[in-house]
Amino acid sequence: MHKRGLRHYNMPVFLILLLVSVIMIFPFIWMVLSAFKSNADVYTYPIRWLPSSFEWSNFEKVFQMVPFLRYYWNTILTSVLQTALQIAMSIGAAYAFAKLRFPFKRTLYMLIQSAMFVPMSVLVIPLYQMVSGTGLVDTYAGIVLPQVLGVFTTMMLISFFTTIPDDLIDAAKIDGCGYFSILWHVMIVNSVTAISAAVLYAFLSHWRSYLWPLLVTNKTEMRTLAVGLKYLISEASSAYQLMMAAALMSIAPLIIVYILCEKNFVRSMTMTGLKG
């Protein structure tokens, strides 16, 4: 009786979650289908849900209209560099706040926490003035460096590092390990799951970054995918099937990366959430 009552109780919840899931995934499905439609299929009425024929030429036209491969390369390069630098800084900061003692530790920790509530739009003007004053506009350094500080990934790793027993660190010190050796052989080795989740989060954030690359790139060859799609919209005019094809190619790597790392991401977020 208890199990039967539980099933009946969960059914409305299941139906609501199913409905919400369908609503959330519908735009993605529509984008995928529209990417293969002809211009006539897009504008036909009543709505044609499936393409009359799969127009693979839509993807070819995108490459002809804008330097899409260049946008891809810029996005991959800047995202990888930003992620690597951000994770390296987050690991170092998390280790210090989780396991070391130093003056004003609590004050600095509160400052880092408060930085999570400062939106990027507030910092855009001073950051742009700094980048422009140092001549880094239209350079990879200008895109990468202002975005390498990751408060969220730092807080995530701090929460995870505090779960590592101090006995492991004490044993490493007895064996003659210094701070950097402990960081590598104890903290990082035992935090692969959390670091993987932080890498995934940082990479996704930098890949879809739009505002900052838009401000510091004036040359076509320096644009990233997010910025390049904006200019494709003006070039493609009313050819929505080309916009959908470009959008699909832009998010394909993100989908692949997330599918490969999804288990680590969920596991790490659950563990750090419980600890916090």
Q: What does each of the following model-derived ranges do?
A:
Residues H2-G276:
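A structural signal for multi-pass alpha-helical bundles of membrane permease subunits
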